[in-house]
Amino acid sequence: MDNYGSTNFNFSKRRFEHPNGENNNRKFLQISKVAYEYFWRDFDEWENKGFPTLNLSKVELAHFSENVIWVGHSTALLNHKGITVLTDPHFTGRAGPFGFMGPKRITSPPFLIEDLPKIDIILISHNHYDHLDKQTIIHLIKLQPEIKFFVPLGLSDILKSFGVKNIVELDWWQSFKHKNIIIHATQVQHWSRRSFFDRNKTLWSGWMMSWDDFSFYFAGDTGYSNDFAKTAKRCGSPTLAAIPIGAYEPREFMKAAHMNPEEAVKAFQDLNTKYAFGIHWGTFKLTLELMDEPPIRLRECLSEAGVPQRKFKCLVHGEQWGDPFGTCN
């Protein structure tokens, strides 16, 4: 195991670690109880229907510009000043190591991989199967082999095994200049694992992309911490942020790794972002809250915090949102 010279690597534990320590150790009985509840909930026909999708054609996507589209879960498509960015691309039917294993997708993507416009940059937050999907990546690079991937420390090896050649690997708070954009890897409170034997052997991160007149923050997957305030202090406040709002119950089990809507609003405020949209909900049934609860709770929390609904939106799958880009025209 290579520590990559990172100060975020715990030598005694032989793994990466957040400054707040590890919080993802769970006892067998805890896991068994949640698994039991999840198993029976999976038979709920209403929740398996998914959500409405605004389907987009290849022709429509060919003219995609100065806009963001929520594709689903943590996948978003963004364009600014001719640069098109895709986050945590996932277009397959399950989030797992095989096509028959892992949480099933309940809301279909709004378009096919083949319909995507030219992608310049892909941001990967970490190696969990609902964020790093092998079949999606393989399909993408067959169609567009020149895409540049930005990944946290340790993920380049697995991407190379998928056939990816153009990779930039960064530690927390490191940055890379791509054309006229500064791309920062930011610290977030989460963890990594892709098998039984590799817990936290690779890093996880959020991402800040900074143009001269616009910035985009992708939180990836994270619990609430002071990382958002740190990010704003180090990288500046973003124009637009993609903030996770789902997969948070049971709270005692998920709190360290996943924010609930109340915490998502706090993150919005800590970042001092102008706009945000919710991700990590409504696509895969991952945890025990009702599938439609995150956007309902988010709207309530925004009202309580005095944040206008138009500033922090829950987009429909496939919905385009151009308002944040009008601030830089």
Question: At which residue positions do the language-model features occur?
Answer:
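Conserved G/P- and acidic residue-centered "switch" motifs that form tight phosphate/ATP-binding loops
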Residues: D88, H126, D221
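Catalytic core of the metallo-beta-lactamase
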Residues: L77-K81, K177-P238, K255-E263
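Metallo-beta-lactamase
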Residues: M1-K104, P109-D115, P152-F218, T239-G246, R297-E319, P324-F325, ...
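Histidine-centered active-site/metal-ligand motif
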Residues: H73, H126-H131, H190-S192, F218, ...
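Active-site HxH/HxHxD metal-binding segment of metal-dependent hydrolases
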Residues: F91-G99, T107-S175, T186-Q187
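Glycine/Thr-rich phosphate-binding loops of Rossmann-like dinucleotide-binding domains
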Residues: A95, L132, R193, R251, ...
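Cap/insert and terminal regions of metallo-dependent hydrolase folds
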Residues: Y4-P19, I113-L116, I121, H128, ...
